[in-house]
């Protein structure tokens, strides 16, 4: 992933609503979510939602498809994985492996309301 694409992606995610929308879409899975449903969950009016979704699209983090009269948005998992890979690619590279455990995958935090 090119540095400019990483900067664009991180810049797009550097806003409370865009980060929340992106996390919602990642959680939703590849089938995505209709714009109206995203707006309802986020409590955003259509114009604000469009603004934020367009920023995520420009950064390549979100894709849009038309299904009949609805616009369906979904996270682009390939781009997400490239971004994470870029950020962790050289993790502890200069330490001679002394901090390899720190560079491992993050443990998931337990979901609220679900049994552990």
PLM regions: where:
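Amphipathic alpha-helical dimerization/coiled-coil segments
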Residues: 1-5, 23-27, 77-116
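A generic local structural motif
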Residues: 8, 58-59
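Short coil turns linking two alpha-helices in DNA-binding domains
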Residues: 45-46, 50-52
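Secondary-structure transition/capping residues
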Residues: 17, 32-33, 49, 94, ...
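Alpha-helical residues within the helix-turn-helix
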Residues: 40, 57-58
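N-terminal helix-turn-helix DNA-binding core of bacterial DNA-binding proteins
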Residues: 4-5, 11-45, 67-79
């Amino acid at each position: 992933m090119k540095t400019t694409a990483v900067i664009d992606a991180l810049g797009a995610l550097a806003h409370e609503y865009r980060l929340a929308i992106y996390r919602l879409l990642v959680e939703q899975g590849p089938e995505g979510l209709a714009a109206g449903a995203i707006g309802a969950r986020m409590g955003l009016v259509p114009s604000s939602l469009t603004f934020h979704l367009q920023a995520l699209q420009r950064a390549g983090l979100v894709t849009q498809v038309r299904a009949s009269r609805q616009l369906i948005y979904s996270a682009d998992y390939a781009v997400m994985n490239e971004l994470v890979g870029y950020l962790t690619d050289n993790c502890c590279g200069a330490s001679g492996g002394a901090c390899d455990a720190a560079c491992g995958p993050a443990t998931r935090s337990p979901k609220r309301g679900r049994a552990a």
